């Protein structure tokens, strides 16, 4: 998730994200491709990135609600 969060922080900019993560640009592209194969969402496409971001927010909210249930 660190890679994904950093990618979102950098407005889906592959070059800047890879620089900040101290990884080669192709490594980041490989990670994004791997995520695309497992989810069907390409985070380099804005609509897919928004869908994924919303899914992360929902998952975080559900985890929070579970913690309130004891």
Outline where the language-model segments fall.
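Cytosolic nucleotide-utilizing catalytic cores of signal-transduction proteins
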Residues: 1-70
């Amino acid at each position: 998730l660190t890679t994904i969060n950093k990618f979102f922080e950098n407005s889906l900019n592959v070059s800047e994200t890879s620089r900040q993560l101290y990884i080669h640009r192709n490594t980041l592209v490989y990670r994004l491709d791997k995520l695309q194969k497992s989810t069907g969402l390409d985070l380099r496409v804005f609509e897919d990135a928004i869908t994924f971001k919303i899914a992360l927010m929902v998952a975080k909210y559900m985890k929070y609600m579970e913690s309130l249930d004891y």
